[in-house]
């Protein structure tokens, strides 16, 4: 009799729960040995990885997959190099598990502190990019968590080949293979099962399109670490340095269009708009960026700027399109960001300390910046070493989620025969 999807996922969940108890007590040396051995296994398996990936690419082309998605799916030699180096870099990161902080003596005589511990079992759901398999597996392993990885069906052969290398790394460190498991069925029912197993899964991390994340957020019976959109802003204040403003607004939009930390709306103080918008518009037009603006923007820049609609202010384009709005003061800029933004990343360009502090205090986003491009909102750029994603939620992890974001804390108490009176 064929095993049902629910039975299969339950089997994976049960095995992950058992493995989570083993990896939680693994030593730092043991975890690092697994990561380095997995890196060596990937290096040795380049022909197998390439063959598996070619099978996925052929299937993708046959199924009419868009060129951009085919590019994300491809495991080029350079991307395999990056995966190998990624494993080695995670092995070098400090191990957060077991760290005790804030120890203090209380009047009762007991000593109380907090110890950092793994979350347990992490389910990760993602699309297209097989390199996410390595990113997710390595961070979960180093943080002492077991993980169940459900990649996109278009990358199934690549993910299986990568998983084989990870299993070899686990075996080399005498760790159970179920510490990292890849879902090998392409049946979409596997996602529904994974997000509704609170007895086996402690948290879900979805990485992909908005529809996937909305579905997971709506249907999950376990906590979810996620962000829906990346509607990021740069506000050019009246006290901005013009050279800095132009450089930042250019980079935030045009360095790359697809990432979630790319600027989608540019806000400009009316007193500086006439000096900063024309040179910026020339840069954007040279780079093929379509401009959509408010009435003041269109009056200033003339023909070629489309009228921005209410929907534009809320849209993550992930394309060479930019909305521009001219405002009269900082208060209006903050109000616009908190109304239309996605609580991801927003930046102010200003030389006024009070304006900068007010922006930092009042903008309700996971990353708030002063005189820096929104493109810096990234775990690597923040010195986290790597990230599993970015969270715009307010509970547990917020912003780029690195090793520490995949852990929790428990109180530890030391006494010497103390009893409560």
Curated annotation (Swiss-Prot):
A Pfam family: Aldedh
One GO BP annotation of this record: L-proline biosynthetic process
EC number annotated for this UniProt entry: 1.2.1.41
One GO location term (cellular component): cytoplasm
UniProt keyword terms in alphabetical order: Amino-acid biosynthesis, Cytoplasm, NADP, Oxidoreductase, Proline biosynthesis
Gene3D superfamilies xrefs: Aldehyde Dehydrogenase, Chain A, domain 1, Aldehyde Dehydrogenase, Chain A, domain 2
Chief localization: cytoplasm
MF term (GO), any: NADP binding
Catalyzed reaction equations: L-glutamate 5-semialdehyde + phosphate + NADP(+) = L-glutamyl 5-phosphate + NADPH + H(+)
Subcellular location: Cytoplasm
SUPFAM superfamilies xref list: ALDH-like (SSF53720)
Domain of life where this protein originates: Bacteria
Pathway: Amino-acid biosynthesis; L-proline biosynthesis; L-glutamate 5-semialdehyde from L-glutamate: step 2/2
Enzyme class: oxidoreductase
InterPro entries: Ald_DH/histidinol_DH, Ald_DH_C, Ald_DH_N, Aldehyde_DH_dom, Glu-5-SA_DH, GPR_dom
Described purpose of this protein according to its UniProt entry: Catalyzes the NADPH-dependent reduction of L-glutamate 5-phosphate into L-glutamate 5-semialdehyde and phosphate. The product spontaneously undergoes cyclization to form 1-pyrroline-5-carboxylate.
Protein family (similarity comment): Belongs to the gamma-glutamyl phosphate reductase family.
Protein's name in the database: Gamma-glutamyl phosphate reductase
Protein source organism: Pseudomonas fluorescens (strain ATCC BAA-477 / NRRL B-23932 / Pf-5)
Gene field: proA
